[in-house]
Amino acid sequence: MSVRYKFRNQEKLYFISFSIVYWIDLFIRNEYKDILIESLRFCQKEKGLDIYAWCIMTSHVHMIIGTRKDKMENIMRDYKSHTSRTLKKAIKDNPIESRKEWMLWLMERAGKKNSNNAKFQLWKQDNHPIEL
C-alpha cells in the first residue's frame, strides 16, 4: 500500500473505497449485499466501528467511517476477510447464480497472482483511506 493512503489517526474520520478483483459486478444480487450489511452491523456492535455514510455499488463499496474501539485497519482487515469467505460460500451455494464458475475462476486467478493470498482473492488489497 502506498504511504499516502493509510489510517494515520484513529480519532479522525476516513473516506474509504474498496473493490472486488477485476471489478466483478458481484453486488447486483441482494443476498450478497445483505452479507456486507450484516457484517457491518457486527463490526459496529463488536468492534466499535462508526459508520457515517455508506454506498454499495455493483463492484465496490464507499464508506465514511470512524472508530471508538479497535483500530480501523484491523476492523477493515477482519471485515474483508470475513466477507470474502462468506461471499465465496454464498456464490458457491447459490443455485441460480449463472456467473458462478466465471466469478470463482477470476477470484482464484487473482489469489494465485497475489503472494498475500493462498488460492483465492475476492477484494482488492487496498481500502484507499482518505482522512476527512
Can you describe what each PLM-predicted range is?
Residues 1-132:
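Short catalytic/metal-binding and nucleic-acid-binding patches
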